[in-house]
């Protein structure tokens, strides 16, 4: 009502803009008028869906991302890329499993808060890590907190406990901390960065059937700097991957096997070999056949960050069925197939002597080795 009155008191375009800026933080919607499922005057009840997302074809997205980092004085590019990969994982999971009710995004000052936005991201990240990499992430949602304290009779005690949990949950470094976070003020500063980056990709599809070079460009800018020289990690250029792939009698192997070839890269890094092989399959197989072949592609990666990068990369290439296992390829298969902490079965399962093709360029340049 107060906001309605402020609009009524605005006598010209300058005052209207001031009210919009101060009350709504310049919020606007990119849908809500011409779509078939929209009811008049119900713009806040719009449910974002996958079908309303646009194809990501803008190379300028990287420059916009870099601009956000400069704007907020974020110099740690590797950390920023790690957090961006986490955001991509959230979005890919959302597009895959929540097509009719997307959770990814900031829904404006009138319908959302920074804490709720991050809470949704943390939930999506937990589900994505479980689904794509078989990793268990500890997370307590706002709904869980409300449910567990629902029966608490003393309202003051309930609020105190909820505030303690909120501080532990949000006011510390986390999987979406582009900036150092250890109090409410820093949480809000980081939330501004997170909001801008989320909004950068919220209206675009990251899962599609065509090749997307955007993530590859980010690899070049963030992954190869420092890691290659300091840790002996090399990312095989796409051109070398393609050269090796073209050297294989792939068409002959496919014609001789009635079942899909089982393929493995036991040190898959950013997933270049896996994605190049999957792209090459498109020359010989139909769209219906491809999915089954993708399910038989396996990558093992010992480095935690790169296992996530590899999964994001395969999804953005439209090859989400590729299996990525966060494990040590030099360990026994029995150990590699379990999560170290709880002994739960990891995904995917690796069986000895079960592969038809090995494509890899394992790390070899480590000082003092």
Summary of predicted features, one role per range:
Residues 68-69, 216-240, 245-246, 250:
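Class I SAM-dependent transferase core
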Residues 63, 78-87, 195, 212, ...:
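Non-catalytic, well-ordered alpha-helical scaffold segments
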Residues 360:
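A short beta-strand submotif of the Rossmann-like class I SAM-dependent methyltransferase core
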Residues 367-369:
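Conserved ATPase-coupling elements of RecA-like P-loop NTPase cores
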Residues 83-95, 315-316:
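Short, hydrophobic/amphipathic alpha-helical patches that form generic packing surfaces
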Residues 89, 96-224:
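Long recognition/docking surfaces used for binding and targeting
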Residues 1-83, 175-176, 180-183, 191-209:
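Short, basic/polar, glycine-containing "phosphate-handling" surface segments that engage DNA
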Residues 234-345, 349-353, 357, 365:
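Conserved S-adenosyl-L-methionine
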């Amino acid at each position: 009502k107060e906001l309605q009155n402020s609009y009524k008191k605005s006598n010209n375009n300058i005052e209207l803009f001031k009210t919009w800026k101060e009350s709504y933080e310049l919020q606007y919607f990119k849908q809500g008028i011409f779509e078939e499922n929209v009811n008049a005057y119900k713009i806040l009840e719009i449910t974002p869906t996958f079908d309303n997302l646009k194809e990501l074809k803008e190379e300028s997205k990287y420059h916009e991302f870099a601009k956000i980092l400069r704007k907020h004085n974020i110099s740690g590019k590797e950390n920023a890329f790690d957090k961006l990969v986490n955001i991509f994982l959230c979005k890919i999971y959302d597009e895959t499993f929540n097509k009719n009710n997307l959770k990814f995004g900031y829904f404006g000052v009138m319908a959302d808060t920074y804490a709720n936005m991050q809470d949704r991201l943390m939930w999506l990240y937990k589900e994505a890590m479980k689904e794509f990499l078989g990793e268990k992430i500890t997370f307590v949602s706002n709904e869980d907190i409300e449910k567990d304290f629902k029966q608490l009779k003393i309202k003051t005690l309930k609020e105190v406990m909820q505030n303690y949990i909120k501080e532990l949950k949000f006011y510390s470094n986390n999987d979406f901390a582009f900036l150092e976070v250890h109090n409410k003020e820093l949480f809000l500063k980081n939330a501004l960065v997170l909001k801008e980056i989320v909004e950068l990709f919220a209206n675009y599809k990251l899962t599609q059937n065509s090749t997307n070079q955007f993530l590859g460009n980010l690899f070049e800018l963030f992954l190869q700097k420092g890691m290659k020289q300091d840790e002996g990690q090399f990312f095989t250029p796409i051109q070398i991957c393609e050269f090796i792939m073209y050297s294989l009698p792939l068409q002959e192997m496919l014609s001789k096997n009635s079942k899909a070839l089982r393929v493995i890269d036991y040190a898959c890094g950013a997933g270049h070999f896996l994605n190049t092989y999957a792209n090459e399959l498109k020359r010989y197989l139909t769209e219906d056949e491809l999915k089954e072949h993708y399910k038989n592609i396996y990558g093992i990666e010992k480095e935690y960050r790169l296992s996530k990068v590899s999964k994001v990369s395969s999804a953005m290439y439209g090859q989400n069925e590729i299996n990525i296992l966060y494990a040590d390829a030099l360990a026994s298969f029995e150990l590699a197939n379990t999560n170290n902490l709880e002994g739960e079965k990891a995904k995917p399962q690796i069986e000895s002597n079960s592969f038809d093709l090995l494509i890899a360029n394992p790390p070899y340049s480590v000082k003092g080795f």
